[in-house]
Amino acid sequence: WNPFKELERAGQRVRDAIISAGPAVATVGQAAAIARG
């Protein structure tokens, strides 16, 4: 068991999640800004 390998894999998973969630977060933020006027 290599903790660094595990960390690397976890980091990639987090990065993938951020990359896929990024556009959604931006859209929600934009919608909220528009709603606030």
UniProtKB/Swiss-Prot annotation:
The keyword NADP does not apply. One of its GO terms (biological process) is antibacterial humoral response. Belongs to the cecropin family. Its main location: secreted. The modification Glycine amide is found at G37. GO terms for cellular component: extracellular region. InterPro entries: Cecropin. Keywords: Amidation, Antibiotic, Antimicrobial, Immunity, Innate immunity, Secreted. It is found in: Secreted. This is Bactericidin B-3. It comes from Manduca sexta (Tobacco hawkmoth). It comes from the Eukaryota. Cecropins have lytic and antibacterial activity against several Gram-positive and Gram-negative bacteria.
